[in-house]
């Protein structure tokens, strides 16, 4: 549950309606119960949607490493803003990987490969309006342009779609949210470009680049 709904669990900053409250075996899952990596994911999501870096959360004391960057695309959207990528560099202690907590690597929590013995590859995830994580990537076009870190730190990032934006130059009045939702196909495990109303605007690949 935390892996897929970290942005929305007990999150008062979730901007699209009610946040999620979860019970497992009649026991409520609070924000304090969440694993550190998923607290980081939620904290990054909140920085993307609020544009504030002084939120009282797991990244509060890591301000100098927390960054937001707007992803701009020309010619295919009414507004050039496709979304915001919020990212940070965190030490092992923030993820509680050191003694006495000894939490596992974020690669394990996110079901990512982490086979490099000398460096840590970045982890990036992406999300649209419902607040459900689609996938965690540490290989491929989402992260190929991001440098790896040493073994004592990790780069964690989330791309938050500008769901209220709309496509331009295509018949109809379709939102960016609708286009991306259809790109997930039935398995909801990735975003893929596709031909939409006899046109392929290549929005996903442009976001990745």
Question: What positions do the PLM features span?
Answer:
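Bergerat-fold GHKL/Histidine-kinase-like ATPase
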Residues: 1-209
């Amino acid at each position: 549950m935390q892996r897929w709904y970290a942005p929305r669990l007990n999150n008062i900053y979730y901007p699209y309606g009610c946040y999620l409250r979860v019970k497992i075996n009649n026991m409520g899952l609070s924000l304090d119960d969440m694993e550190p990596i998923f607290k980081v994911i939620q904290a990054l999501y909140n920085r993307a949607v609020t544009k504030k870096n002084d939120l009282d959360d797991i990244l509060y004391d890591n301000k100098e490493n927390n960054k937001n960057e707007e992803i701009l695309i020309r010619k295919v959207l009414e507004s050039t803003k496709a979304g915001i990528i919020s990212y940070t560099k965190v030490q092992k202690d923030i993820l509680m990987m050191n003694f006495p907590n000894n939490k596992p690597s974020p690669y394990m929590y996110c079901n990512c490969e982490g086979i490099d013995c000398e460096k840590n590859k970045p982890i990036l995830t992406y999300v649209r309006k419902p607040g459900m994580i689609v996938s965690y990537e540490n290989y491929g076009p989402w992260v190929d342009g991001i440098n790896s870190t040493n073994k004592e730190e990790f780069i964690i990032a989330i791309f938050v779609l500008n769901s209220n934006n709309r496509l331009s130059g295509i018949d109809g009045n379709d939102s960016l949210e609708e286009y991306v939702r259809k790109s997930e196909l039935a398995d909801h495990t990735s975003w893929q470009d596709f031909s939409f109303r006899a046109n392929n605007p290549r929005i996903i690949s442009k976001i990745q680049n």
